[in-house]
């Protein structure tokens, strides 16, 4: 779906939206894997003091709860009185509702596609960022794109078709298909530390935030478990222990969102992976 927010932050000081400290603000929801990918990019680049952050409630709420005819759902904040109002394009006022993540400057909404925002944070702030970490290095761009369109998309699609299945029977069928993809990923990770090259990239951040959500919702009674795939377990520990990543994970918000969507479902039994335990992934570098 095309976005009405398709502007870009650029390095040039003469750009319409130049990279500047304190000019941009990020709105994220911890229960959303796409928003957490962007939050991870902000942290890995060391932009915490340059790009502001507001965290929404883990579940969309009715934006006009007193109007029974308006069923629109959108962002809410734990303390909305402290959240700055936002003026969008053409001086139009926008309540804090919509698709997340969003990057906003003091005048306009900029972008709401997670991959675009990740790459803007990675490139536009390169000269200002304390960290020289690159999520999308030019020399690996083609391989990262192939990974995103390949194994990352397969795992993401498998997770959502299982998690959002309409019946238990369909969920089990989709789960079996998902683990076929997981086995392929585990075999890949037996040979290499990361999905692309010898460094963590945006492909790994995307994969991580999908896999941990599956770990959260999987059941002890499942015939197959994520913990049976030791290369994936080590991979998840490796990424989780990378500075800036652990703070993008909020298990409580994930559970709150799941319970809201499936109020009759039992409480989640995961996560099962011990994310803070040692790993030996560096040996593959």
Give residue spans per PLM region.
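C-terminal alpha-helical interaction module
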Residues: 1-285
């Amino acid at each position: 779906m095309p976005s009405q927010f398709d502007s870009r932050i650029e390095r040039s000081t003469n750009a319409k939206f130049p990279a500047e400290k304190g000019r941009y603000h990020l709105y994220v929801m911890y229960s959303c894997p796409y928003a957490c990918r962007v939050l991870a990019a902000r942290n890995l680049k060391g932009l915490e003091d340059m790009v502001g952050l507001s965290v929404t409630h883990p579940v969309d709420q009715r934006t006009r709860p007193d109007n029974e005819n308006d069923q629109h759902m959108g962002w809410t904040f734990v303390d909305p009185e402290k959240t700055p109002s936002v003026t969008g394009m053409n001086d139009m006022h926008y309540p804090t509702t919509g698709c997340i993540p969003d990057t906003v400057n003091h005048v306009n909404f900029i972008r709401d596609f997670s991959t675009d925002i990740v790459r803007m944070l990675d490139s536009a702030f390169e000269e200002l960022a304390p960290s020289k970490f690159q999520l999308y290095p030019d020399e690996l761009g083609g391989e990262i794109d192939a990974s995103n369109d390949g194994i990352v998309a397969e795992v993401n699609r498998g997770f959502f078709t299982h998690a959002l299945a309409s019946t238990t029977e369909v969920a089990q069928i989709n789960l079996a298909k998902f683990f076929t993809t997981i086995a392929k990923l585990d075999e890949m990770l037996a040979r290499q530390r990361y999905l692309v090259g010898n460094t963590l990239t945006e492909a790994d951040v995307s994969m991580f935030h999908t896999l941990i959500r599956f770990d959260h919702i999987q059941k002890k009674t499942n015939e197959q478990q994520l913990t049976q795939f030791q290369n994936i377990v080590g991979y998840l520990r490796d990424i989780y222990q990378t500075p800036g990543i652990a703070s993008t994970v909020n298990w409580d918000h994930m559970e709150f969102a799941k319970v809201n969507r499936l109020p009759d479902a039992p409480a989640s039994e995961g996560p099962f992976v011990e994310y803070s335990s040692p790993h030996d992934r560096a040996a593959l570098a």
